[in-house]
């Protein structure tokens, strides 16, 4: 049985620039939306949110308890981060109907070892890190596994259609899209200097300020 996650939220009246005060007091502003419901501005204890997000990610259901409302089943759908500290400064929850299929992005986890990669003859070229699937909310897996142990020749590759799906899950990403392939190690090494040259320029240091999206929140 999958772990159950819950969060207690409160309706939020503070919007715009004033939300900075909430963040300084350890409160994370958030929005709940979904099919058939009006967007709800809410706030949640930042530590509680971070603890749940670390375990649930964006593919596990979270039961939201909002004062004065019935509990809602939702996914953590989108995050806004501070451009310098990378702290989460806003979250979007996507409320769902448990009886209706949804389309979500699920991360791909590489498993096993290609004999050619293990011998040093090849390097792995991973094109996709996640794919879109359709399923009932309760059937959405935390991730999908990509077994590369069968990649024992350079002409072999793995496409989306080759991935094993749990019962009740179908593909939304086209099946002919490439997931992983092999490249000759020597060719990859020869290309590396050119790639390094393109990233040798130092990044410009921009003025530190809060993002416009934060200032115009809501």
From Swiss-Prot:
Keywords in alphabetical order: Ribonucleoprotein, Ribosomal protein, RNA-binding, rRNA-binding
InterPro entries with a match to the protein in the record: Rbsml_bL25/Gln-tRNA_synth_N (IPR020056), Ribosomal_bL25/Gln-tRNA_synth (IPR011035), Ribosomal_bL25_b-dom (IPR020057), Ribosomal_bL25_C (IPR037121), Ribosomal_bL25_long (IPR001021), Ribosomal_L25_dom (IPR029751), Ribosomal_uL5_bac-type (IPR020930)
Compositional bias annotation for Basic and acidic residues: 203-212
Species the sequence originates in: Roseiflexus castenholzii (strain DSM 13941 / HLO8)
Protein name listed in UniProt: Large ribosomal subunit protein bL25
GO terms (BP aspect): translation
Amino acid composition bias (Acidic residues), ranges on this chain: 190-200
Function, as annotated: This is one of the proteins that binds to the 5S RNA in the ribosome where it forms part of the central protuberance.
GO molecular function term, any single one: structural constituent of ribosome
Record note on quaternary structure: Part of the 50S ribosomal subunit; part of the 5S rRNA/L5/L18/L25 subcomplex. Contacts the 5S rRNA. Binds to the 5S rRNA independently of L5 and L18.
Pfam families listed in its UniProt record: Ribosomal_L25p (PF01386), Ribosomal_TL5_C (PF14693)
UniProt similarity note: Belongs to the bacterial ribosomal protein bL25 family. CTC subfamily.
HAMAP family, alphabetized: Ribosomal_bL25_CTC
């Amino acid at each position: 049985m999958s772990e159950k996650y819950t969060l207690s939220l409160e309706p939020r009246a503070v919007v715009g620039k004033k939300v900075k005060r909430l963040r300084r007091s350890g409160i994370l502003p958030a929005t709940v939306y979904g099919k058939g419901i009006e967007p709800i501005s809410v706030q949640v204890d930042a530590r509680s949110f971070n603890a749940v997000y670390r375990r649930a990610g964006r593919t596990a259901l979270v039961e939201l308890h909002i004062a004065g409302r019935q509990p809602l089943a939702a996914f953590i759908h989108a995050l806004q981060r501070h451009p310098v500290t990378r702290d989460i400064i806003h979250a979007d929850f996507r409320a769902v109907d448990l009886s209706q299929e949804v389309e979500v992005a699920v991360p791909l986890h590489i498993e096993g070892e290609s004999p050619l990669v293990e011998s040093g003859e090849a390097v792995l070229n991973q094109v996709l890190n996640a794919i879109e699937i359709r399923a009932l909310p309760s059937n959405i897996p935390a991730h999908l596994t990509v077994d590369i142990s069968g990649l024992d020749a350079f002409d072999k590759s793995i496409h989306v259609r080759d991935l094993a799906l749990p019962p009740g899950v179908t593909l939304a990403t086209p099946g002919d899209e490439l997931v992983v392939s092999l490249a000759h190690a020597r060719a990859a090494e020869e290309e590396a200097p050119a790639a390094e040259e393109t990233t040798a320029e130092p990044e410009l240091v921009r003025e530190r300020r809060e993002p416009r999206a934060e200032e115009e929140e809501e």
